[in-house]
């Protein structure tokens, strides 16, 4: 009886997962045009300017490209007790998901100390928690992460490169 219930659960879980809205579409990689990349980076810098970072002075901005073309900005928001601090990437994802959007193609991320001029400093890769949030909603084979210093100086990675052997929803089935 237990084995039969487990089998039924597995069949149902596989059906639900394979029929999730946009699941099959996530397998298709979208080629990002240069102007789209530059716009994402520009919007990430706009978001970075809104960061609330009174403690670290390290401002991060993100611009998340949804499957339909809409862009969601996010900035990091610090808190005096540190634990409730939220990263820019998660802010962008949570804004989109709270509006019912769960399919994404790319994200641009910029970050640096507030006093460092644009184009100087270093690239700002996402933290482990943000990579895991990306893995929840994005196909690691196709989702593109743009790490930028400026609109013309950037690197593009696939999620699978920044989160190899990532744990995702299909691992719970």
Predicted regions and their residues:
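Short beta-strand scaffold segments in enzyme catalytic cores
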Residues: 59-65
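Hydrophobic "anchor" residues
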Residues: 70-71, 153
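Compact, glycine-rich, soluble single-domain proteins
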Residues: 76-88
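C-terminal binding/interaction regions
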Residues: 28-32, 36-47, 104-173
């Amino acid at each position: 009886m237990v084995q039969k219930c487990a089998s039924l659960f597995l069949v149902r879980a596989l059906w639900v997962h394979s029929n999730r809205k946009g699941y099959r579409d996530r397998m298709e990689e979208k080629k990002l045009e240069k102007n789209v990349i530059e716009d994402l980076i520009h919007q990430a810098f706009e978001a970075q300017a809104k960061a609330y970072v009174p403690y670290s002075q390290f401002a991060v901005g993100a611009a998340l490209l949804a499957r339909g073309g809409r862009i969601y900005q996010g900035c990091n928001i610090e808190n005096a007790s540190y634990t409730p601090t939220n990263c820019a990437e998660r802010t962008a994802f949570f804004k989109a998901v709270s509006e019912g959007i769960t399919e994404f193609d790319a994200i641009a991320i910029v970050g640096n100390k507030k006093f460092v001029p644009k184009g100087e400093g270093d690239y700002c890769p996402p933290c482990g928690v943000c990579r895991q949030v990306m893995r929840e909603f994005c196909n690691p084979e196709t989702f593109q992460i743009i790490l930028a210093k400026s609109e013309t100086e950037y690197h593009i990675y696939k999620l699978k490169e920044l989160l190899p052997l990532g744990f995702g929803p299909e691992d719970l089935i």
